[in-house]
């Protein structure tokens, strides 16, 4: 993936990617699915370099969903070994590139070796202040919200907070990535047009970009296209756009030439 820099004033700060298509990529080449996952790791490395070069604040990669346990046992086993190997070998690169790594998801379900690598990688990179790299592993958006509810329920039980004090602002402190800037853009590869239980709370106002390109073929061109698409959009967050606002001030009717 090229290190081409994107020059935009309206550039996303936090991009999340649903990395879909590894298995189909391998099948198209007559290979086992694990070959697709290994190729996907290389695409992830290139995407991280691209994010660093373009000064993103955060990049979140959806690596393994809570639903992926339903896949064949051998594939799951291969993925766990691959994840362990990648983490163990990437620590020096994370330090060199000032990357702060965070694994979001229920890591208690992983084997002890993988849990050890996760904790080690997070500890070593904790003080880095460059790219915030989040890897969603054994993650589900519903799980995230539920574990947040459980945490805030404990606060209520202890009398730290009262039920009528709970609002969006303080609830979001109990879910993943609460310390980071919001997700501006979600990219999904592989041709599917859905979010697959990914960051349900965090992407409430995110822009979405879908591409038919399978993840191992994802490159700087597609990444740039996604950012360019984002830069052209007007994010209204429930408000009307500036043109409609002027019409409304004049006529009291914002329906002309507007999209609801």
Swiss-Prot record:
The keyword Magnesium applies. Keywords: Cell shape, Cell wall biogenesis/degradation, Magnesium, Metal-binding, Peptidoglycan synthesis, Transferase. Mg(2+) binds at residues 20, 193, 207. InterPro entries: UPP_synth-like, UPP_synth-like_CS, UPP_synth-like_sf. Its EC number is 2.5.1.31. Binds 2 magnesium ions per subunit. GO terms for molecular function: ditrans,polycis-undecaprenyl-diphosphate synthase [(2E,6E)-farnesyl-diphosphate specific] activity; magnesium ion binding. Its cofactor is Mg(2+). The keyword Transferase applies. One of its GO terms (cellular component) is cytosol. It catalyses: 8 isopentenyl diphosphate + (2E,6E)-farnesyl diphosphate = di-trans,octa-cis-undecaprenyl diphosphate + 8 diphosphate. Pfam families: Prenyltransf. One of its GO terms (biological process) is cell wall organization. Coiled coil: none annotated. Substrate binds at residues 21-25, 33, 37, 65-67, 69, 71, 188, 194-196. The active site is at residues 20, 68. It comes from the Bacteria. Homodimer. Belongs to the UPP synthase family. Catalyzes the sequential condensation of isopentenyl diphosphate (IPP) with (2E,6E)-farnesyl diphosphate (E,E-FPP) to yield (2Z,6Z,10Z,14Z,18Z,22Z,26Z,30Z,34E,38E)-undecaprenyl diphosphate (di-trans,octa-cis-UPP). UPP is the precursor of glycosyl carrier lipid in the biosynthesis of bacterial cell wall polysaccharide components such as peptidoglycan and lipopolysaccharide. HAMAP family: ISPT. NCBIfam families: uppS. This is Ditrans,polycis-undecaprenyl-diphosphate synthase ((2E,6E)-farnesyl-diphosphate specific). It comes from Wigglesworthia glossinidia brevipalpis. The lineage of its organism: Bacteria, Pseudomonadati, Pseudomonadota, Gammaproteobacteria, Enterobacterales.
């Amino acid at each position: 993936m090229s290190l081409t820099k994107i020059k935009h004033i309206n550039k996303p700060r936090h991009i999340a990617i649903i990395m879909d298509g590894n298995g189909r990529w391998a099948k198209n080449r007559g290979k086992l699915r694990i070959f697709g996952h290994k190729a996907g790791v290389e695409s992830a490395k290139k995407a991280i370099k691209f994010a660093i070069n373009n000064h993103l604040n955060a990049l979140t990669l959806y690596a393994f969903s809570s639903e992926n346990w339903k896949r064949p046992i051998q594939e799951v086993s291969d993925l766990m070994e691959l994840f362990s190997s990648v983490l163990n070998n990437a620590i020096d690169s994370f330090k060199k590139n000032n990357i702060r790594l965070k694994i979001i998801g229920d890591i208690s379900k992983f084997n002890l070796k993988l849990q050890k690598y996760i904790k080690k990688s997070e500890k070593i990179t904790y003080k880095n202040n460059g790219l915030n790299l989040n890897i969603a592993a054994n993650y589900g958006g519903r799980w995230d919200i539920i574990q947040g509810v459980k945490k805030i329920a404990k606060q209520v039980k202890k009398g730290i907070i009262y039920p009528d004090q709970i609002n969006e602002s303080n609830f979001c402190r109990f879910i993943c990535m609460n310390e980071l800037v919001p997700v501006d853009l979600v990219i999904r590869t592989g041709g599917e047009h859905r979010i697959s239980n990914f960051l349900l709370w965090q992407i409430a106002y995110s822009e979405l970009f879908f591409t038919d390109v399978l993840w191992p073929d994802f490159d700087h061109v597609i990444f740039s296209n996604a950012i360019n698409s984002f830069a052209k959009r007007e994010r209204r967050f429930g408000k009307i756009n500036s043109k409609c606002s002027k019409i409304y001030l004049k006529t009291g009717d914002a329906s002309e030439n507007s999209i609801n």
